[in-house]
Amino acid sequence: VQTCALPILSHSGWKGTVGKMGAATITAMKREFGTEAKDLVCAIGPSICQDCYEVSEDVADAFKETFPGHADEILLDKKNGKCQLDLWGANEIVLTEAGVLKEKIAVTNICTCCNPDLLFSHRASHGKRGNLGAFIYLRNA
């Protein structure tokens, strides 16, 4: 049994979220390390917020299919063929359905689109390319 903390970083945009990347990561951690989802502490890092994230009907339909019973929680219908998507909420659902305890999930609530001075945002830059980097490390106690 592994007794030390294993830092894992997993990226999930809208396609990864529809594909339940968080659950797939937990499954791989269980297989490779014997990790139990209930023992995990997870964080949902900076990304675009629901107010800034307008998606087309086909993307919204993919979320409705993947998250039956949760569409009203993660999609706001704009009545113009577009919806506002809550990726933070959708990923929280993925993690809790995979067995992570809700109280062990932290959401940064930092929107990349609202904070272009701090973080790159494809939407805020109107489609210009840029990069974000992330890292995680263990500090010796």
Model-predicted segments: where are they?
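Active-site microenvironment for binding and transforming phosphate-containing groups
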Residues: 1, 5-141
